[in-house]
From Swiss-Prot:
The keyword Transmembrane helix applies. This is Uncharacterized membrane protein YnzK. The keyword Transmembrane applies. Keywords: Cell membrane, Membrane, Transmembrane, Transmembrane helix. The gene is ynzK. It comes from the Bacteria. It comes from Bacillus subtilis (strain 168). Pfam families: YoqO.
Amino acid sequence: MYRNIVFYLILLCLFISVVMKSFEVIRTIANVICFIFVLLYFKDEMKTYSRKALAILSICFLFLVGICAFIILQGQTLMKRHLFFTGLETIAGILLIIVSLSICTFILRKISNRLKRM
């Protein structure tokens, strides 16, 4: 029950963040609260890790977020320069985001499974 409530609160915060595009302060607050709700959602799973494993996992998460953002930004500029993507920018952008997030999720899951065995 607790996880369901937190899940719907995460969706609500994401919805507020998308709807309030012109209000930057409200959008920033919604993003921070969403991050807190995500941590609450995974609270029980985080208890299985040691402090060292959580530190390593946090560093890897921050590193992969930076890499994922870099891949998405460079992919967007690459798509704007090439004529091949003319008319397909939306589909190519969505595929770029899905592929980069999938790769980062795969790497983070592999690291997480290896740290659970420690």
